[in-house]
Every structure is written in C-alpha cells, then in structure tokens.
Amino acid sequence: PQALSPRGVWKKFTPKGLFETVKKDDLYFRATGGGVTFGGGEPLLSCKEILHFHKHCMDNGKNWKINIETSLNVPGIFAEVLVGLVDHWIVDIKDMNPEIYEAYTGKDNKFVIDNLQHLIANKAKITVRVPLIPEFNTESNVEKSIEALHKMGITDIDRFTYTIKTH
C-alpha cells in the first residue's frame, strides 16, 4: 500500500511499516471503534498486503476495523481473499447499466456484479455509492441502478452527484 504524504509525495508502506505508522492512533481506534480504510486507486490489487497488515495487527493484539473503498472491478480472487476480515465494503458502482459503466470506465462491469453478489452471499456489510455522473448517466439511470441494487439485497446506498470543476 501507499499513501500521499502532507508534502504531496507518495510513500510506499510495507504491512509492518503501515502498522508502525498508524499504531499511534490505537487509543482513538479503541475509543471510537475505528480502524483503517484502504482506498484510492484500487486497493484490492494490494489484497495480499492488506491481508498481511491485518495479520500483523492481530499478532500485535490490535483488532482494528478494516474497511475497503473499491470499484470491485477486479477478478474475484482479489476480493475473496479479504471477505472474512473486512468490516465494511464501500463500493463505487458508477452505474449498474453495462453500457453506461463501460462508457465511463472503459471496462465492462461483470467483475463488479460478480464480486458484489459474492459479498452479499457472504453477508458482508456493504455500502454502495451510486453517482449521477454528468454527461454519462441520468437521474432515471441512477434510479434504475438503485432498484437493481435493492433487488440484489443492498439496502445501504449512498446516492450523490459528481461535481465537475469548471475553470
């Protein structure tokens, strides 16, 4: 895993190095029930490092919550490795319509749907983020995505609008 430092420089972490960096927040994590959220880029591509980080935490008596903010657009094995240890999955779905999804991301959403179904089957805690993306989907598309998610059993849905910066 890596993180952006306050100086705007990316820093790479080993699982042990990340543990050493965040352990100073242990009291806060225990007081609030908090933990570490992996996001940015696609954290599931670092699933082995996240797994090793979690193991290092447990080996050191730290049962911090692990959250993943993901697109889920990776082969199933990447998510499967973490299913039992992730406390909360935050999934940016873009749109459930395959054509809209591909127009926006350049990829199909088969992995997304398959992985989402796998998480649901494993009773994972999931929040799905469904954005209105100007020039890519409409309010009606967002409603259809939410309806499809409800049919799958998803109840925690974060609907929002992408903000496009103008110069």
Segments predicted by a language model, with ranges:
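Alpha/beta-hydrolase active-site loop
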Residues: 16
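Canonical Radical SAM [4Fe-4S] cluster-binding loop centered on the CxxxCxxC motif
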Residues: 1-12
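Conserved AdoMet/S-adenosylmethionine-binding subsite of the radical SAM
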Residues: 19, 23-162
